[in-house]
Swiss-Prot record:
Source taxon at top rank: Bacteria
Key word Iron present: yes
GO biological process, one term: iron-sulfur cluster assembly
Subunit relationships: Homodimer.
HAMAP family per UniProt: Fe_S_biogen_NfuA
The protein's required cofactors: [4Fe-4S] cluster
Entry function: Involved in iron-sulfur cluster biogenesis. Binds a 4Fe-4S cluster, can transfer this cluster to apoproteins, and thereby intervenes in the maturation of Fe/S proteins. Could also act as a scaffold/chaperone for damaged Fe/S proteins.
Name of protein: Fe/S biogenesis protein NfuA
Family classification: Belongs to the NfuA family.
Bound cofactor: record note: Binds 1 [4Fe-4S] cluster per subunit. The cluster is presumably bound at the interface of two monomers.
Record key words, sorted: 4Fe-4S, Iron, Iron-sulfur, Metal-binding
Gene: nfuA
NCBIfam families per the UniProt record, alphabetical: PRK11190.1, YhgI_GntY
Organism: Vibrio campbellii (strain ATCC BAA-1116)
Residues that, per the record, bind [4Fe-4S] cluster: C151, C154
């Protein structure tokens, strides 16, 4: 069974929408290009004839959510919410594992660090058009990273490394990582954020 949360407000929203659809219509939650940097999540109507034998069905009050076999592991820990604020109402879908499958706690250190970088660090850097990649982890526990995009050449990269990335990684990998170092040959240009 998948660990997907659809909040009460989102369930009410879906039930209202589905009430205007043909009998037996449910919803489908899916990921296009799962496991890649181009992964995109979506929700669509799912008429009875579109249900596949390999789909996972998650029943809710008044409807079911169907998830295809390929999307399922990438929707682990996903949350669908319907939020109303002064700007209006919108459906939000957060799927932290859409771009990269969740790794187990006993996976090799390099896989666990890469997972945290891709799912927690890079989404924050993306707002500035930047990203960071793990180059290697040395024998003495130093994570070597390389910045790209808007982070390359940015005057704030040292602060981002020390106060953001290093603090986050050392906090999550106590006793396993000792430091985080930048291996980027920074080239300041129009692409640089600051």
């Amino acid at each position: 069974m998948s660990n997907i949360t659809i909040t009460e407000t989102a369930q009410t929203h879906f039930a209202n929408l589905l009430g205007q659809q043909p009998e037996g219509t449910n919803i489908r939650v899916f990921v296009v290009n799962p496991g890649t940097q181009n992964a995109e999540c979506g929700v669509s109507y799912c008429p009875p004839e579109a249900v596949e034998g390999t789909d996972t069905e998650i029943p809710y009050s008044g409807f079911s959510a169907f998830i295809d076999e390929l999307s399922l592991p990438f929707l682990e820990d996903a949350e669908i919410d319907f939020v109303t604020d002064k700007m209006g109402s919108q459906l939000t879908l957060k799927a932290p594992n859409a771009k990269m499958r969740k790794v187990s706690d006993d996976a090799p250190l390099v896989e666990r660090v890469e997972y945290v970088i891709q799912t927690q660090v890079n989404p924050q850097l993306a707002g500035h058009g930047g990203h960071v990649n793990l180059v290697e982890i040395t024998d003495d526990g130093i994570a070597i990273v390389a910045f790209g995009g808007g982070c390359n050449g940015c005057s704030m990269v040292d602060v981002t490394l020390k106060e953001g990335i290093e603090k986050e990684l050392l906090n999550q990998f106590v006793g396993e990582l000792t430091a985080v170092r930048d291996a980027t040959e920074h080239d300041r240009g129009d692409h640089s954020y600051y």
